[in-house]
Amino acid sequence: MARVKRGVQARRRHKKILSLAKGYYNARRKVFRVAKQAVIKAQQYAYIGRKQKKRNFRSLWIVRINAAARMNGLSYSRFMNGILKCGITLDRKMLADIAVHDPAGFTALAEKAKTMLAA
């Protein structure tokens, strides 16, 4: 049986890892063993970051809605409750966008929420 050396596959695998490690400093870029660990850790951080991004944006939207609601005399929770009772099905992302770019429109939504809460 012939001996298998795997030279081509190993070089290809090393090149792939080292190309993923571009932009890293010192041995993390040049030494395969260190670069492989750095790339694996970077991919873990990227995976975690994609989950955290969703949480961070949701909290940002809530902060923006809360600030705009308080300018109209409502707390965030009472505003959201009033919006829900009105049957307005805007998500937090859209409400935050309206709060930032169209304050008059948000005021109209807040007034509707107030009327539903008063009733």
Swiss-Prot record:
Molecular functions (GO terms):
rRNA binding; structural constituent of ribosome
Q: Name one GO biological process term.
A: translation
Q: Which Gene3D superfamilies match?
A: 6.10.160.10, Ribosomal protein L20 (1.10.1900.20)
- Keyword Ribonucleoprotein listed? The answer is yes
Matching InterPro entries: Ribosomal_bL20, RIBOSOMAL_L20_CS, Ribosomal_protein_bL20_C
Function summary: Binds directly to 23S ribosomal RNA and is necessary for the in vitro assembly process of the 50S ribosomal subunit. It is not involved in the protein synthesizing functions of that subunit.
Q: Which family does it belong to?
A: Belongs to the bacterial ribosomal protein bL20 family.
According to UniProt, the name of this protein is Large ribosomal subunit protein bL20
